[in-house]
């Protein structure tokens, strides 16, 4: 006999099968479940979201870009985009926004962010700390591979800090990067040491590194050590090129306090060696300003970080405080949309590629959107995050007179085969304490009547 389920009961069963997610902003993203039931994937405000999957699975077009559009429907929210392909810049750039890039080719007038290092330092709450931080980022890669040259490179870093100290405290002009770096490249050792002596805090540095006494400077002859230090100083100065050595007055401080302005960091792999220190500094500056107790920026900040782990390519760590922002940024109004192809690539964003800090930092992402993973560590980590459950298996006996054997085994809620079978545009959603749900995101054309 065939019994039909009453329509009312069938509707109740379908309602019970729908995931119980909290409501997000703008009604969420249109999707459908395995059975074809329509569902709205929420994009919660203030919740960090991690999106992972191999290339070509639709991480950007199906989720991250539409999610960013929903969050930016709030006119008070500011946004920072990090990307490699200018996808977000082409979609979200508006008149008045700023774009950080090594090259200014093809950009609208006044769109290029022309950073002024001196003005940035003067606007900071602690000038000396800002000077030290800028110097550390510029010399970080040299110091990491210093070897026996450590003392010379450290001396060059301290010399650069001394120059910034003189410009910030002893002059009134906000000299552009082009003017400052151009002058440093042309100065002789004697002229540079005489310039450093204008600030009392540099006197000890001059005696320790160069054997230079400002009170008895007449007849001073630069030592061989001075020449070695200048070599490493000029190596760091060579990083100032392209847009990073332009004449301008832009600062991160001003961006955070300008209403309705978004910032785009387009990382060009062709100029990665030059761009990396500046990109890492800008991201850390944004994070520090937003998390600071003294920050007067009340507007919520959305950071869309698409393939930001590529900053660590080439075996160089790119620690800008990502996991600190993920775990502590919610109270400060900082929200992250992080996209990566592999969770192991995030190790490069932790200090010294520390995998334990990177794994622990995943606690700052209550929502994960997992498209098809491509490596075993990412798969195993996702299965751990998504949880496990006991499944009962019954094994039939060989003889009909024997009893069947029943076993209970602890298995992941999403198996490796289920992850491997995910088609482009299909992903598992895990939000807070809800069970993972498989959805297929609907393209905009599919939502038309």
Predicted region positions:
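Short, polar loop/linker segments at the starts of domains and inter-domain junctions
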Residues: 39-41
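Residues immediately N-terminal to the Walker A/P-loop in ABC ATPase nucleotide-binding domains
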Residues: 44
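P-loop NTPase motor domains
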Residues: 2-37, 48-334, 405, 414-449
């Amino acid at each position: 006999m065939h019994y039909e389920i009453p329509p009312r009961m069938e509707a109740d069963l379908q309602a019970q099968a729908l995931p119980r997610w909290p409501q997000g902003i703008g009604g969420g993203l249109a999707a459908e479940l395995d059975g074809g039931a329509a569902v709205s994937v929420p994009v919660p405000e203030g919740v960090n979201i991690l999106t992972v999957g191999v290339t070509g699975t639709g991480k950007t077009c199906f989720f991250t870009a539409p999610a960013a559009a929903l969050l930016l429907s709030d006119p008070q929210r500011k946004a920072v985009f990090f990307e490699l392909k200018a996808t977000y810049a082409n979609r979200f750039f508006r008149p008045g926004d700023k774009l950080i890039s090594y090259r200014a080719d093809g950009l609208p007038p006044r769109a290029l962010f022309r950073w002024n290092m001196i003005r940035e330092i003067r606007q900071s709450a602690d000038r000396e700390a800002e000077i030290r931080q800028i110097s550390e980022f510029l010399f970080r890669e040299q110091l990491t591979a210093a070897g026996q040259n450590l003392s010379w490179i450290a001396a060059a870093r301290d010399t650069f800090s001394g120059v910034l100290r003189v410009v910030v405290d002893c002059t009134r002009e906000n000299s552009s990067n082009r003017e400052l770096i151009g002058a440093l490249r042309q100065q002789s050792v004697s002229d540079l040491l005489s310039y450093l002596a204008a600030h009392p805090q540099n006197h000890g540095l001059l005696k320790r590194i160069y054997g230079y006494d400002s009170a008895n400077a007449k007849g001073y002859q630069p030592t061989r050590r001075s020449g070695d230090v200048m070599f490493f100083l000029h190596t760091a100065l060579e990083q100032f090129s392209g847009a990073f050595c332009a004449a301008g007055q832009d600062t991160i401080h001003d961006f955070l306090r300008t209403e309705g302005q978004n910032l785009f960091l387009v990382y060009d792999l062709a100029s990665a060696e030059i761009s990396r220190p500046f990109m890492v500094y800008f991201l850390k500056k944004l994070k520090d300003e937003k998390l600071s107790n003294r920050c007067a920026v009340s507007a919520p900040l959305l950071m869309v970080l698409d393939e930001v782990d590529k900053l660590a390519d080439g075996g160089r760590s790119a620690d800008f405080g990502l996991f600190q922002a993920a775990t502590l940024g919610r109270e400060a109004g900082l929200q992250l949309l992080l996209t990566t192809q592999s969770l192991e690539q995030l190790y490069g964003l932790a200090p010294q590629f520390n995998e334990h800090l990177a794994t622990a930092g995943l606690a700052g992402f209550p929502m994960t959107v997992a498209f098809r993973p491509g490596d075993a560590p990412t798969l195993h980590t996702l299965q751990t995050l998504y949880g496990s459950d006991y499944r009962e298996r019954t094994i039939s006996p060989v003889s009909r007179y024997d009893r069947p054997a029943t076993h209970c085994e602890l298995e992941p809620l999403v198996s490796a085969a289920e992850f491997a079978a995910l088609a482009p545009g299909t992903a598992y959603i895990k939000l807070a304490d809800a069970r993972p749900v498989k959805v297929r995101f609907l393209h905009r054309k599919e939502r038309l009547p």
